[in-house]
Amino acid sequence: MSDALTRAATQLIDPQGRVLAAAVRRLQLPLHGLDADLRWPVAVIGSGQPLLLLHGFDSSMLEFRRLVPLLQDHHELWIPDLFGFGFTPRPEALDYGPQRVLEHLELLLQQMPPGPIGLIGASMGGSVAVVLARHMQEKQPGRISRLLLLAPAGLTGRPMPLPPLLDRLGAAFLGLPAVRRGLCRQAFADPDAAVGPAEEEIASLHVSTPGWGQALARFARSGGFAGVGDPLPEPPIEVLWGAQDRILRAPQKQAAQQLLGERLVLVDDCGHLPHLDQPEQVAKTWLAA
């Protein structure tokens, strides 16, 4: 378990981030070939029908901090760090790719209450949600009841694995403080108003987790999640996409619109992170169904 996440429960600038970090459980999940004593972080908070929330690339569970207060009276929220991301353990000499991410989530589902589960995925987490729902409809029909995707990344296109050396250089570049600050600002519709020390702290906190660069490089080498949206899974799907999204460019948005059709709704005054820029609209969309 990352020391940074333990400290976050009391030391984060953002009070909503502190609440979420304090709700973390450390689960043992029997992933193939890994030490059974490893502990995997997942925040569990609220009461009601279970709802699983999946964060994006090079992020952590803490990105859902503003959405949690709006949903926790209606749902028991399960918010994991995806395998190889956030504050998860990162054993050496291991492949980090989509298959491991899905294996980890399938084991997590076995720990969740029985019955239908809702699923919200943001950015890359949207593609993870689609793949997980499609997988579960074959293994356990009805387990995933519906999906809400927030600016989903990777539904279209094709995998583009980075070769050795370039993957490590890319990870090192993403670790630079100035680069992280720039990406954090780029993710919001109005960074001058929305981004300050609290946002920058959470966007970079997990970089201190041991093995961060190695795992990120190996995930990039795998090609990650790309072109995974067709066919879409059977459960109902809604999609929110920020009108001011500057992370996913126009061609990606157009391809997603062709795939998703009327399921996709544009959100004004919103960048790449609807759950941070417009959490009330995200919660309203989910609770209205």
Segments the model singles out, each with a brief description of its role:
Residues 63-65, 88-94, 158-161, 250-251:
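Conserved catalytic-core motifs of eukaryotic protein kinase domains, centered on the activation segment
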Residues 1-31:
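An N-terminal hydrophobic leader/cap segment in hydrolases
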Residues 176-235:
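Conserved alpha/beta-hydrolase catalytic His-Asp/Glu region
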Residues 236-270, 276-277, 281:
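Conserved loop-alpha-helix segment in the C-terminal half of the alpha/beta-hydrolase fold
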Residues 18, 25, 31-36, 40-45, ...:
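Active-site loop/oxyanion-hole signature of alpha/beta-hydrolase fold enzymes
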Residues 134, 142-174:
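Flexible "cap/lid" loop of the alpha/beta hydrolase fold
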Residues 41-87:
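Conserved HGGG/HGGXW glycine-rich cap/lid loop of the alpha/beta-hydrolase fold
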Residues 121, 125, 129:
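Gly/Ala-rich beta-loop-alpha elbow adjacent to hydrolase catalytic centers
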